[in-house]
Amino acid sequence: MRLARIALPWLAALVAAGCTQDISSPFSAVVVAWDPANQIYELAQVKLSTLVSLRDMQGTSGNVTAGGSARLLTSDTLRPTASISSLRQGAFLTAPGPVAVEFNTANGLVYPEDEAALELVSFYAALEKSRAELSIWGFSNLVAAPIFSHTDLRNEDFLSPLAEGELFYEPLNAFFLPVLNPKQQIPPQLNLGVVAHAVAIQAWQQVVWAGAPVDPAALLVATDPAALTSVHVAQSLRIGIGDFLGTLITVDPRWFDHSLPQTASARALDQLRCGSAAMLNALDVPDKDVPYDPYPLGTVLAYSLWDSALNSDPTAVVTGVVAALPGIAAAQNQNGGKLALAAALDAIVAATQGSAQGYLCGELLNGFHALSVTDLPTCDTVGVHAPPASCQ
């Protein structure tokens, strides 16, 4: 079902409704939202709690601007003196401008007046929900990031650096909402799983990278080739955590299907995912020779976390994952700025409470065995619960 078709049922209400002045939260609006019980996207009434201005889309979860263009070179992000502030100052060729959301009210509800308004209000609702869930899971101090809608973002090859449907771009510490694609069933910015994944990536940057625009290990690669493995490990781990949180918030192991059909089957978490020697061998291959694909290894982590949640205590697993972020940062700092796969996995287990630890140990040791993860120190002190399906 396309976005325009989802919007049709309420058009009649707009004819009789009058245009209103600007309003601020709290208020309820009709948006495109995910229904986990029926596993569909539909128009639904949702409460928005953090908008200071609906008309301007300004709020404590992030401020929206639209249009403009930006180009950022990888070499610029790797300068030792680069900061998010300096990169933002130099990246924009034409500045995005303010938005003016058109809406009407009827029967105490806000109705976005057109597709553009529906897109922005629906995204903001998904962003609020993702941030609220992250707070429940133990991360309540996520900084609000700018939101750029339909901004033309390019790299040195004049390609989008967010080619896989991602919404969050770390070097600029900002959300970028792509132009709507009529071929997509649900645009990524309206897909709750995609938004939750983006929020997880932001949380990783804020904690593990201490707010740096890139992985600190990336600055070591020129003089320490071993740092390349760390960079690739981190790319996969943060994607795996993002995919897990996207699955947990939607209760849908195939949330990719609605927006990312080209990668959906490869990232779906409804089937066993196992590490391989090929994944291990890819970790130290320079990107100039073969660009690293972080998704296969990331999917192994996401599956291990999701299956642990299904078979034990999902709250314990997800709060453990969120609580592990400082431990992952510490493991990287204690290893000369380089992150080892086993150390990161052990940090997740160590931060997990109760019987879920044993299930998590079983899943991680099973899924990552082919990547030479045969022992996790924390697992030596807890009972390892064998997973339902084996990779060995």
What is the meaning of each model-derived region?
Residues 1, 131-138, 250, 313:
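Secondary-structure transition/hinge residues
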Residues 1-8:
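Bacterial N-terminal signal peptides that target proteins for export
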Residues 9-13:
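Terminal and linker regions of secretory-pathway proteins
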Residues 15-18:
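C-terminal motif of bacterial Sec signal peptides marking the signal peptidase cleavage site
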Residues 20-136, 140-147, 153-187, 205, ...:
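Acidic/polar low-complexity interaction segments
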Residues 110, 116, 123-129, 146-392:
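Extracellular protease catalytic domains of secreted zymogens
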